[in-house]
Every structure is written in C-alpha cells, then in structure tokens.
C-alpha cells in the first residue's frame, strides 16, 4: 500500500496523506486536489475504490424545495437536459411537507457519490438559515452551485435573476397604463429574493424615496403571504381593499390567486384590476385572461448553473460570486389601462 500511495502521490503532485484522505473519503480535501488524485489513479491503472467509482459515474444532485410551483419542474427540465448532454445523470431530490429536509437530501446525495449538487431556491435564500452547512459541504470536497438566492457568507457560485429589475419592469409597465395605486404581493420577508423585489418595487413606485416615505410605501402597498395560489389570493384581497388598481405578484401562482381574489370581489381582470406575475411558468399564457408576467430567464440560468458546476467538478472553478440574469416583461391580457384612465384622449 505504501508503494501504491507513493506512486499516486508523485503522479498527482500531493502528499501520501492527501492521497489517503481521498481514497478513504475523508473531508478537508479541495475539489481540484481530489480530482488530481482520481486522475492519477486512472493514469497509473489502479482500480478506484467502489465509493469513488460511484462518484465518477456522473451523478449530479438537484435539490428543489417543491414541485407544485411549475417554475421548479421547469428548472429541473432545463438542468436535467443540460447535464444529460454532458454525460451526467441528474438525481432530483425534492423536499415535501413533513418529509426530508434539505440537509437530509444533501446527505443522501453525498452517500450516493454525486459529483456535485445544484440547489434551487434552497436555504441559501433564507437570511435566517445557518450558512455553515454549505461550508461543511465544501469541506467534504463536494462542488455545488446555488440558484436563486445569495449569501455573502458562502464561498460558492450563485446564479440569480435580477429581482430589482423585474419589479422595475412590472411597475413601469403599470404606470404607463395610468395606475398610481400599485400593490406588491410576495412571500415572507426573510428570503433574499423577496427583499430585493421590495427594494426594486419601492424605488420604482416612488423615486427618490426617503426613509419615512419608504416605510409608508411598504406598510400600505406591500403584502406578505405564501408562494401559493391561496397566498396570492389573500394578499391581493388585502391590497385591493386598500384601493390598489394593480397588483404585482412574486410568482405566477400568486398571480392566479390574485385574479381569483378580484373575481370573488366582483371585479374584472383587467378592466377593474390589473395583475402581473413573475416567472412565466409553462402554460401560464393559456390562463384566463392570459397572464402578463415578468419572465425569469430559466433556460439561461439553468444552463449557467450546469456549466459552472461542471467547471467546479473539472478542477477549474468559476469565481465565487453572483451571476445575475436579466428578466423580461411579457405583456398579455391581465393588464390594461387604469379604470380612471379609460376614455381619456
């Protein structure tokens, strides 16, 4: 064994102790160093240990918080196809209420010997979560990429949409239609994308915004709820009750709930209330009315996540910073001129 370790160490340009840690699956070895040792095994004709053979089989984990929101299956499809084209097999791991947590899914994937993991809207987006979990994962030599969320505490590549720009697009569109009382329905404030959307919304609704005015805008025009149809319905009901003639929603599912809320109040969309979604989920163009929404660049984000992860796996890691992708406004049938603007020359 000593001779074998010495040969591998010499080929990889590392110490025998490092080779031993890699062969025994011990933490504390950088991903690039681990790959060098595995490459040395192959070059010298040594058979990889069983656990390391599983790792080299090309499994990549994809962790999502749910599949009920159609944006997550859309991400899974794009990422899965991109991985398959590169010879990797995606392993989808989804959290369920009362089921496995993100940490438990991570352990399952690591035990299966995945080459890396992509997290979509995971705990990295929650400002109250312990970010040390990602540092520990990196310490075990498992490359990972984080999609839709950001934390300066984590040294990893992040892939995000420009949430501030998304709100600016939505609000500017509604203002151009004559709306002056615009509400924002979105999820719990502890999430980074939510905080960024609020920033973009407030800045666009009232520029410049003083501290006092910002507080007033948030109190009157921002309603937090859940990222569900029912959550959107509840938030929109509250905003319409505050005389909003337009509602911007942080997801398409919430927007469908907002349309339901308006109808239950005897209002027509878009005649009485305009609604804008976010995501441009599959089939959303076929709702009644077809939903105006801000399109999240899912194909570009998903492909970038795969490309970045494969660079990490291949030993040429991407910069540990945030890659931001621009959204796009898609105007359909759920927005129209503000009620008071109709008939004006």
Swiss-Prot record:
MF term (GO), any: DNA-binding transcription factor activity
Organism: Streptomyces lividans
Domain HTH lacI-type: 1-58
DNA bind region: 5-24
Pfam family, one: Peripla_BP_3
Protein name: HTH-type transcriptional regulator reg1
Classification via SMART domains: HTH_LACI
Role this protein plays: Transcription repressor involved in control of expression of alpha-amylase and chitinase genes and of actinorhodin production.
Coiled coil: none
Keyword field: DNA-binding, Repressor, Transcription, Transcription regulation
SUPFAM superfamilies according to UniProt: lambda repressor-like DNA-binding domains, Periplasmic binding protein-like I
Top-rank lineage group of the source organism: Bacteria
